[in-house]
Amino acid sequence: CVSLTLKDHRQKNIILIGDSGAGKSETLEALRQVASDYVVDMTTIFDDMGTLLIEDNVMKAYGTEIGAFVRTDDLENGYTYKVFDRAIFMNPSLSNARIVLPISSYDDITTGINIDYILYANNYEESANKIRLFDNVASALEVFKKGARVAKGTTGETGLVTTFFANPFGPVQLEEETNVLLDKYFKYFFDNDIKVGEIYTGLALENGAENPIYAATELLKKLKED
C-alpha cells in the first residue's frame, strides 16, 4: 500500500495485492520513476502485512511494520549501497537475495488512510490495457480469490500456480472465515466507490523487467484523471 501526494496537493492511496513475484514491488518502483514530475511524496504504508478496518462505516488502511523485507533485484540499481549503513542483507551472493530496510515511520503506518484503488497484480497475461476495473463484486472476487500468478523463482513453486486470495499465510488455512470477510469488504469497496481492478504487470512475460513501466504509466494516467 502506498500513499501518493500529487503536485496539486491531492492524495491518492493504492493497494496492490498478489503473491510473491507478481510484480507489486516492480510496479511501485516503476511508478516512482514515471511519476517524478507529478508526485511530491510517495509513502509506503505497508509492504507485506496491512490491515483494513471499518469503523462507523469508514474504512481505513493501517500498516503493521515500518520496514520491508524485499528482493534486491526489485530495487533500482545502486539503491542497496545508499542504505548499506541501515540495512540487513540476507544471502547477498545468491539468487533471490533479500534485504531488510526501514521504509516508513510509526506515525505513517498507524494514522490510517482512505483507499482509492485496490488492484490485483497479474504477472502472466498480456493486455493492451494495463488496468482493468471491475464493475461488480462477483467478478472482482473471482480474480482475487483465485490468486493466480506465474512463479518467478521467489519460492519453490514453478509455472502457473494459484493460492487462495494470493496469500499462503492465513486465508488458505481459514478459508471459510476469510470468505465472510471478503464478501463484507468487497461489498464495501463497491458501495463506496473504491476502484477495484487488475493491473497487468507482465513480469512473467517476455522482457518482463520492462513491462511494469507500462503498467505504472497507465496507473499514473488514471490517478491524474480522477
Where do the model's predicted regions map?
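Short, surface-exposed amphipathic charged segments that create phosphate/polyanion-binding patches used
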Residues: D8-H9, V58-A61, N211-L219
